[in-house]
C-alpha cells in the first residue's frame, strides 16, 4: 500500500506542479482581500481533478468586518467509510508581493537551483502549496481505495481565504456555521517539523489626542506627537523585560512587542493634535491573553498620564489565541513522523513556532491539530512574506507522499 501511494504521487507529480502553478498565477492579495475570484479558479482546478467542491460564500457583512472585500471558503469531502473525519486546512489568501522580486510574483516560474527545481511566486510556500499537497494526497488515497485498500473515515479539504487577516471568516466561520465537525485536523505547514504549538498575537490601535495650534506658538496647543514619542519610549523600554520571559515550548523563545504603523499630524506648520499607531504583541503559549491586554492598557494609560491634556483611546484590532496541544494531537504527529522519516531520511521533530495560524481555530473547539505540509526548514529559506518566495518542488512531492501515508494510517 505504501508503494502504491508513493507511486501515485510520483506518477502524477507533473500534474500537481501544474496545479500549483495555476493557483499561484491568480492573485489573491489580502489586503485588499478580494479573494472570491481565486476561490472560483481553485474550484475549477479541483473539479478538473475529479473532486467535488462545496463553495461557501461568506456573507458580505462578515467579510467587511474582517476588513476584506470577498471570501468564498471551499470544502471538499470524500467519505471512505465509517470512522473519523480528518480536515486538511490551507489558506489561499496571500500578503501583497511588495518590491525587490527577481521573478514575476504571479508567474510561477520554475528555476533549476542547486538543490533542484524551485518554483517562485507569492503564496507558493504560504500556503497555496498545501492546496496541492492536500488535494493530491486525497487523490492518492482514492486511487489506493480503487485498488482494494480499505479506509475508514472521511477526508475533508478546508481551503480558506482570510488567514492573513486573522481567520475569523475562514476556518472559524466554517466551524461556527456547523459546515464541518472534524475529529482531527492538519493545517498548512512545512515538511521538516510537525508544529504542535504557536504564539498568540494581540493587535491594539492606540489613538493619542491633544490640541492643534500654530507652530509659531506651540505652547498654545497640546502636542500629540510629543506625547506619543514618550509613550513609544515606554513601550520599547518594556522589551527587555519581555525578553526574560522564556517559553518552555521548543521553537518558541519569548514574547515580543512591535509598533508597525503610525500616522497623524495636519501640516508641517501645525502642532499635531492626533496620532494613531498600532502595536503587535506576540504571546507565548504560557501567557493568558486577557491578562496581557489588561496589562498593556494599564501601561499605555500610565505613560499617557505623564502628559497633561492628552487623551488616549485603545482599541483591540485582533486577538489570536496561542495554540497549545490538544489531547489526541500525538496520534496525528506519530502518523506523520514515521513516513516522514522514511521519505526524507531524517527524524522530523515536534516543535512550536513564534507565528500564529488558523490552526488555533480548530484547537479552540477541542479538535487535535498539528501543522504539516510542503516547505523547507524555515520561513527564511522560503522567503515567506518576502520577495522571491519559493518552494523546492522536491519538498512538495515529499510532503504529498507523507500526508497521504499519514492519512492512510489514521483511516486504517
PLM region descriptions:
Residues 1-4, 65, 190, 195-197, ...:
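Metal-dependent amide/peptide-bond hydrolase catalytic core
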Residues 2-124, 143-151:
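Acidic/His- and Gly-rich active-site-bordering loop/insert found
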Residues 54, 86-88, 158, 184-186, ...:
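Hydrophobic/aromatic beta-strand patches that form the interior of the parallel beta-sheet core
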Residues 55-56, 152-160, 186, 247, ...:
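Beta-strand segments within the central parallel beta-sheet cores of soluble alpha/beta enzyme folds
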Residues 118, 123-201, 411-412:
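Acidic/histidine-rich catalytic neighborhood of metal-dependent amide-processing enzymes
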Amino acid at each position: 500500500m505504501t508503494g502504491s501511494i508513493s507511486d501515485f504521487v510520483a506518477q502524477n507529480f507533473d500534474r500537481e506542479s501544474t496545479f500549483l502553478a495555476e493557483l499561484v498565477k491568480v492573485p489573491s492579495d489580502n489586503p485588499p482581500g478580494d479573494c472570491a475570484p481565486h476561490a472560483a479558479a481553485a474550484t475549477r482546478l479541483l473539479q478538473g481533478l475529479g473532486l467535488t467542491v462545496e463553495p461557501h460564500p461568506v456573507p458580505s457583512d462578515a467579510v467587511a468586518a474582517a476588513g476584506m472585500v470577498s471570501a468564498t471558503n471551499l470544502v471538499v469531502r470524500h467519505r471512505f467509510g465509517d470512522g473519523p473525519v480528518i480536515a486538511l486546512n490551507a489558506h489561499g489568501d496571500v500578503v501583497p508581493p511588495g518590491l525587490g522580486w527577481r521573478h514575476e510574483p504571479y508567474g510561477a516560474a520554475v528555476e533549476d537551483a542547486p538543490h533542484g527545481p524551485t518554483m517562485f511566486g507569492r503564496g507558493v510556500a504560504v500556503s497555496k502549496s498545501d492546496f496541492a499537497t492536500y488535494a493530491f494526497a486525497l487523490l492518492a488515497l482514492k486511487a489506493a481505495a480503487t485498488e482494494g485498500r480499505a479506509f475508514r473515515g472521511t477526508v475533508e479539504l478546508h481551503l480558506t481565504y482570510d488567514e492573513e487577516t486573522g481567520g475569523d471568516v475562514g476556518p472559524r466561520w466554517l466551524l461556527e456555521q456547523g459546515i464541518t465537525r472534524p475529529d482531527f485536523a492538519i493545517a498548512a505547514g512545512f515538511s521538516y517539523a510537525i508544529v504542535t504549538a504557536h504564539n498568540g498575537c494581540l493587535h491594539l490601535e492606540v489613538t493619542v489626542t491633544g490640541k492643534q495650534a500654530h507652530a509659531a506658538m506651540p505652547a498654545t496647543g497640546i502636542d500629540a506627537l510629543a506625547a506619543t514619542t514618550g509613550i513609544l519610549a515606554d513601550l520599547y523600554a518594556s522589551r527587555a523585560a519581555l525578553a526574560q520571559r522564556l517559553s518552555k515550548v521548543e521553537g518558541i523563545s519569548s514574547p515580543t512587542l512591535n509598533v508597525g504603523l503610525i500616522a497623524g499630524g495636519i501640516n508641517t506648520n501645525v502642532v499635531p493634535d492626533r496620532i494613531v499607531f498600532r502595536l503587535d504583541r506576540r504571546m507565548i503559549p504560557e501567557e493568558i491573553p486577557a491578562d496581557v491586554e489588561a496589562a498593556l492598557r494599564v501601561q499605555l494609560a500610565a505613560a499617557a498620564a505623564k502628559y497633561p491634556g492628552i487623551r488616549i483611546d485603545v482599541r483591540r484590532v485582533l486577538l489570536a489565541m496561542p495554540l497549545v496541544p490538544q489531547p489526541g494531537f500525538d496520534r496525528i504527529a506519530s502518523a506523520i513522523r514515521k513516513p516522514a522519516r522514511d521519505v526524507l531520511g531524517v527524524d522530523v521533530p515536534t516543535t512550536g513556532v513564534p507565528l500564529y495560524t488558523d490552526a488555533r481555530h480548530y484547537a479552540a473547539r477541542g479538535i487535535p491539530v498539528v501543522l504539516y505540509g510542503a516547505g523547507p526548514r524555515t520561513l527564511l529559506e522560503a522567503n515567506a512574506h518576502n520577495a522571491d518566495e519559493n518552494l523546492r518542488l522536491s519538498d512538495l512531492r515529499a510532503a504529498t507522499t507523507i500526508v497521504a501515508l499519514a492519512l492512510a494510517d489514521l483511516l486504517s
